[in-house]
Swiss-Prot record:
Signal peptide: none annotated. This is Sodium/potassium-transporting ATPase subunit beta-2. Glycans are attached at residues 96, 118, 153, 159, 193, 197, 238. It is found in: Cell membrane. GO terms for biological process: cell-substrate adhesion; intracellular potassium ion homeostasis; intracellular sodium ion homeostasis; lateral ventricle development; membrane repolarization; motor behavior; negative regulation of glial cell migration; neuronal-glial interaction involved in hindbrain glial-mediated radial cell migration. NCBIfam families: Na_K_ATPase_bet (TIGR01107). Residues 1-39 are cytoplasmic. It comes from the Eukaryota. Residues 193-290 are annotated as: immunoglobulin-like. The chain crosses the membrane at residues 40-67. The gene is Atp1b2. Belongs to the X(+)/potassium ATPases subunit beta family.
Length: 290
């Protein structure tokens, strides 16, 4: 014989719920007395306080082993990468000569990017250094901070400096300037050579044919050793990265050209196919003419 439970009315359910929240007979709130609530809250307070203290202590111990100025591990940063300016989506530099808006955005980006390289700013913040040798600034037991940096003046970029340039870095005439920038690597030394240099080529035979002639600033795409080593953002406060400007003179119009630029030095390997971004950068260049 099945015994059916008596179905509670809505009022009974409400009364039971009210009694669960606050029972005036036992003075319990949500099934616990005030003392019980005090003990359980104290337990969780101590428990989570202990976890917080342990986390804080382990973080503090770890941070004592980390330098504010130099990364502890640099084995995966031995070879610097390259990047181009103007910075574009997918590294595609596309110029429509007759469409001002297509290249004006590049010009505005370059104006902002090159502003810190103005000769007046460089003379105010950085030193005139002796070329052909590293500008080393050892601590010798005493923290040598901040490190001084060598001047890289905008005028060194020649026809790509944008100073008094009616062609807007060549973008209005179909002879654009693309700037090659080497990423910063702390304590990087290029080797015993007097300088490094950037070289650019078409990736394939047809790209080489369509690329045409180009000139580089500084001459031969040289990057002097006096801009190295780099000591880090906090040490080298006013450090200015050296640049190489590539001015493309007669790119075949209306054709997409794949360009690859590399930095060459004794201590830089550019033939590692496992890392296609080591010491090189590839970008697409297209000059559209009506």
């Amino acid at each position: 014989m099945v015994i059916q439970k008596e179905k509670k009315s809505c009022g009974q359910v409400v009364e039971e719920w009210k009694e669960f929240v606050w029972n005036p007979r036992t003075h319990q709130f949500m099934g616990r007395t005030g003392t019980s609530w005090a003990f359980i809250l104290l337990f969780y307070l101590v428990f989570y306080g202990f976890l917080t203290a342990m986390f804080t202590l382990t973080m503090w111990v770890m941070l004592q082993t980390v330098s504010d100025h130099t990364p502890k591990y640099q084995d995966r940063l031995a070879t610097p990468g390259l990047m181009i300016r103007p910075k574009t989506e997918n590294l595609d530099v596309i110029v429509n000569i007759s469409d001002t808006e297509s290249w004006d955005q590049h010009v505005q980006k370059l104006n902002k990017f090159l502003e810190p390289y103005n000769d007046s700013i460089q003379a105010q913040k950085n030193d005139v250094c002796r070329p052909g040798r590293y500008y080393e600034q050892p601590d010798n037991g005493v923290l040598n901070y901040p490190k001084r940096a060598c001047q890289f003046n905008r005028t060194q970029l020649g026809n790509c400096s944008g100073i008094g340039d009616p062609t807007h870095y060549g973008y209005s005439t179909g002879q654009p300037c693309v700037f090659i920038k080497m990423n910063r690597v702390i304590n990087f030394y290029a080797g015993a050579n007097q300088s490094m240099n950037v070289t650019c080529v078409g990736k394939k035979d047809e790209d080489a044919e369509n690329l045409g002639h180009f000139i580089m600033f500084p001459a031969n795409g040289n990057i002097d050793l006096m801009y190295f080593p780099y000591y880090g953002k906090k040490f080298h406060v006013n450090y200015t990265q050296p640049l190489v400007a590539v001015k493309f003179l007669n790119v075949t119009p209306n054709v997409e050209v794949n360009v690859e630029c590399r930095i060459n030095a004794a201590n830089i390997a550019t033939d590692d196919e496992r890392d296609k971004f080591a010491a090189r950068v590839a970008f697409k260049l297209r000059i559209n003419k009506a």
